[in-house]
């Protein structure tokens, strides 16, 4: 704008300021949104009164922008009743300058729209075979595990090479970690040298299946790690000289089962329903009876109130496996699953 010579200086300055204000206002009249929904509308309002350049400067793939300068009531109606804002303009139409974050890459999908997909860098992986993850699942290789971590499990790591095992035989744990078998009969690599903090209350005490009182869940985990096999949780609180299950109080929907072999009780979950599966293998239990499955054995234990454990797989009168039982007991503990408070 050029001021005419005959115009007063004050009026010219006022017009200049007004023009500048209108330019700034028009540049900030849009609304910035965090995503464009499948219906084509903008959703999740990020900030109002932003220009498209400001809104799209983050590099996020899903960020979108609308140019309408509307009041709060209209924005509210769009978000609550209309499924988002109309005339939604995505910031990114191609993969150029898209930041997908670590382990992901931008690729154009079948609809010719940019999308972030999991693409971990597997070039430095030397072990090409299967690996066992911290979730207890076997992955065909470490690259497959990295993809699973990218998609839904950010804490997922490789705990050891090879398929997940039921015993510590042939399990080589990395670093200073040690293999331990938990009560679900799965081998895990754990670190035994962690320092357990002193418990702030005696209410943290736990009674182990070995009849020993542990100061906290951490102390029980450490003892389990050093032993190399599961000790297991009998019940919460200090161990008592119980004469029967009537002396033991179980919480969390658990039921006391009495172990006549050692004269102690333990609290076990008894709400598991056994699936109708023909693939389950029969087991020989500690009462020398054969059950259709380990789950059926647990049901019988919960019904009778007497603890049952697996002696060996198969029928009780099918084979005599005294030596095999001794080998199994070195690595496995077929008692009930450990409390979630004791998970590694």
Curated annotation (Swiss-Prot):
Gene3D superfamilies referenced in this protein's UniProt entry, alphabetically: 3.30.60.30, TGF-beta binding (TB) domain
Cystine pairs: 32-55, 42-88, 56-91, 95-106, 100-116, 118-150, 122-143, 132-164, 168-179, 173-189, 192-225, 196-218, 207-239, 245-256, 250-267, 270-302, 274-295, 284-316
SUPFAM superfamilies: Kazal-type serine protease inhibitors (SSF100895), TB module/8-cys domain (SSF57581)
GO annotation terms (biological process): ameloblast differentiation; BMP signaling pathway; cell differentiation; cellular response to growth factor stimulus; female gonad development; gamete generation; hair follicle morphogenesis; hematopoietic progenitor cell differentiation
Domain Follistatin-like: 94-117, 167-190, 244-268
Major location category of this protein: secreted
SMART domains in the cross-refs: FOLN, KAZAL
Annotated localization: Secreted; Nucleus, Nucleolus
GO molecular function, a single term: activin receptor antagonist activity
Start-end of Acidic residues biased regions: 321-333
Domain of life: Eukaryota
Pfam families documented for this protein: FOLN, FST_N, Kazal_2
Family annotation (InterPro entries): Fol_N, Follistatin/Osteonectin_EGF, Kazal_dom, Kazal_dom_sf, Prot_Inhib_GrowthFact_Antg, TB_dom, TB_dom_sf
Glycosylation: residue positions: 124, 288
TB domain residues: 30-103
Keyword Glycoprotein: yes
Signal peptide: 1-29
Function, as annotated: Multifunctional regulatory protein whose primary function is to antagonize members of the transforming growth factor beta (TGF-beta) superfamily including activin, myostatin, GDF11 or bone morphogenetic proteins (BMPs). Mechanistically, binds to these ligands in the extracellular space, blocking their type II receptor-binding site to inhibit downstream signaling. Plays an essential role in muscle fiber formation and growth both by preventing the repressive effects of myostatin and through SMAD3/AKT/mTOR signaling independently of myostatin.
Protein name: Follistatin
